[in-house]
Amino acid sequence: PILAAAAASMGASVTCAGMFDGVEKEEIDFIDWQAKERMSLFSLGKPAVTYALEFADCKYMFADCGNLGKQMQGLNGKREKIEQAIRAADIIACVNWAVMPEVKEVLQRVFQNSSASIKSRYLFLDLSDIRRKDSQSIQEYFRSIALIKNKNGIKTCLSINENEFDVLCKKLDMDAGLFEETLSALRNKLNLDEIILHAMKTAVFCSNSVFCTEEKQQIKDPVITTGAGDNFNAGICVAKLLDLPPKEQLN
């Protein structure tokens, strides 16, 4: 919902399927009224509860995600409408795969098992915390993404932070060395069109033909950093909708 709200605040028309427990968009207090008018919500169940402890040099997050699988049963009654919205979207952002693996099934139904036309130009991916995922599950997920890409011609983009980058490299037995070399190797291994890395001070774009970096603007004393990655991803998604070049996407 943070990504969806941020994209709507920048002018995008957004459909968001997530864990809202039946809450209407008018009740969500962190979204301004203009953004709410551009949002459609599908509630799939009760949200997980996350406690974030932020310090000057690090952050600890404690999430109770144990019931998410059971709560995702709410998907069944809304599957057709959600799949229709996915087919009609210019960009599809699939985030938080680590705790919502049902995303894979939904994508397979929409792209691989359907003869309906797909409007989407981009499939934007964010894995979230994959420390508990094994290498086989990760590779199976990206194989399904590669099948979607090859069948439909949709461009694929993975957004990862520095911690996720390190964990992903370890899971895939890769050396997390120089960003340029490792990101290129990772992109090839996962058969992706693009990887965007958002580290603490730098953002990096890597595709087959473009590799560029951009220094990130630093806020000296931020009130909160939880959700920063979601807001960054929202900016990337809107930039892609506007067909901005890679360096401007990072800006």
Question: Where in the sequence are the language-model features?
Answer:
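Ribokinase/PfkB-type carbohydrate-kinase core domain
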Residues: 1, 9-15, 19-211, 244-245, ...
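Hydrophobic/aromatic ligand-binding patch that stacks against planar heteroaromatic rings
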Residues: 6
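Conserved post-catalytic alpha-helical subdomain immediately downstream of the catalytic base
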Residues: 194, 217-251
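Short, surface-exposed loop/helix-turn segments at secondary-structure junctions
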Residues: 213-215
